[in-house]
Curated annotation (Swiss-Prot):
It is found in: Plastid, Chloroplast thylakoid membrane. It comes from Phaseolus vulgaris (Kidney bean). It catalyses: 2 a plastoquinone + 4 hnu + 2 H2O = 2 a plastoquinol + O2. GO terms for cellular component: chloroplast thylakoid membrane; photosystem II. The lineage of its organism: Eukaryota, Viridiplantae, Streptophyta, Embryophyta, Tracheophyta. The record marks Y161 as: Tyrosine radical intermediate. Residues 345-353 form a propeptide. This is Photosystem II protein D1. The gene is psbA. PSII is composed of 1 copy each of membrane proteins PsbA, PsbB, PsbC, PsbD, PsbE, PsbF, PsbH, PsbI, PsbJ, PsbK, PsbL, PsbM, PsbT, PsbX, PsbY, PsbZ, Psb30/Ycf12, at least 3 peripheral proteins of the oxygen-evolving complex and a large number of cofactors. It forms dimeric complexes. [CaMn4O5] cluster binds at D170, E189, H332, E333, D342, A344.
Length: 353
């Protein structure tokens, strides 16, 4: 009998740990995905903060011209960034122990790769943790599905794009002005504004903002009055109440008359699915667009597509954008190459007499 009790005790230690990890009674749900999420996100966050404050300049282009990104090296919150790993490293896995010294690792931008890889693993686990908690509570899995959109976008700019371009130095810098620089260079090299998937992403983000504002304002305008004129309307709601807090019939009637009848949802469930799906699908397409442009399947090129009867070019806005792209391409990485890639790739004129 004693032996049986001891075996149960030894089994229960692991069992208690499993129950604690997967318990929905904890103040914050951990879950098995959380076991990996917590250390990876803590690592990414810690290294980001330290590097943003104190990292030395990084030779991002691999031409012995380091770029400063940290606060202690002259930057402010706007101009500061974690500089991407050097082009000299390319796509090589570059942990600290692969460098000859910590100084070399910092000079070649090792912190960027460390932060990005831990961050992507962490947010993927966060998405898995959302699904896991939904599963434990008997909920549907759509919260994790919605979160997959920003996860896909982050993976596209931090991992897929560098893979397609052949170097982590082409990844998005971790900072405000660095993000803007990434966007400008991306437009110059890939003409993203003329890519249909980017257009769908813009429609998703702006449309989602519009629909969110419309829904919130309609609900707020059709609340069922539960308070006096001297009280806040918000005091009329009690958490967990069974009664509707707004009149969906009134909201439906208002919006149907404002635009037309079938523009208004008469089903609350389909309405909220639409509100979730619109921006999520748009951001999915944007991430897919970044991932295709990573391998140089670029936006539409309508340059010099309109000519008159004499064959002379009539400039369109596409030509104006192309001129701006060339200018931006000339100005970035000025010392890394002498000509924009589009011009450098042109066939050389014949010099034969």
């Amino acid at each position: 009998m004693t032996a049986i009790l001891e075996r149960r005790e030894s089994e229960s230690l692991w069992g208690r740990f499993c129950n604690w990890i997967t318990s929905t009674e904890n103040r914050l749900y951990i879950g098995w995905f959380g076991v990996l999420m917590i250390p990876t996100l803590l690592t990414a966050t810690s290294v980001f903060i330290i590097a943003f404050i104190a990292a030395p300049p990084v030779d991002i282009d691999g031409i012995r011209e380091p770029v400063s990104g940290s606060l202690l090296y002259g930057n402010n919150i706007i101009s500061g960034a974690i500089i991407p790993t050097s082009a000299a490293i390319g796509l090589h896995f570059y942990p600290i122990w692969e460098a000859a010294s910590v100084d070399e690792w910092l000079y070649n931008g090792g912190p960027y790769e460390l932060i990005v890889l831990h961050f992507l693993l962490g947010v993927a686990c966060y998405m898995g943790r959302e699904w896991e908690l939904s599963f434990r509570l008997g909920m549907r899995p759509w919260i994790a599905v919605a979160y997959s959109a920003p996860v896909a976008a982050a993976t596209a700019v931090f991992l897929i794009y560098p893979i397609g371009q052949g170097s982590f130095s082409d990844g998005m810098p971790l900072g405000i002005s660095g993000t803007f620089n990434f966007m400008i260079v991306f437009q110059a090299e890939h003409n993203i504004l003329m890519h249909p998937f980017h257009m769908l992403g813009v429609a998703g983000v702006f449309g989602g903002s519009l629909f969110s504002a419309m829904h919130g304002s309609l609900v707020t305008s059709s609340l069922i009055r539960e308070t006096t004129e001297n009280e806040s309307a918000n005091e009329g709601y009690r958490f967990g109440q069974e009664e509707e807090t707004y009149n969906i019939v009134a909201a439906h009637g208002y919006f149907g008359r404002l635009i037309f009848q079938y523009a208004s949802f008469n089903n609350s469930r389909s309405l909220h699915f639409f509100l979730a799906a619109w921006p999520v699908v748009g951001i999915w397409f944007t991430a897919l667009g970044i991932s295709t442009m990573a391998f140089n399947l670029n936006g539409f090129n309508f340059n010099q597509s309109v000519v008159d009867s004499q064959g002379r070019v009539i400039n369109t806005w596409a030509d104006i954008i192309n001129r701006a792209n060339l200018g931006m391409e000339v100005m970035h990485e000025r010392n890394a190459h002498n000509f924009p890639l589009d011009l450098a790739a042109m066939e050389a004129p014949s010099v034969n007499g």
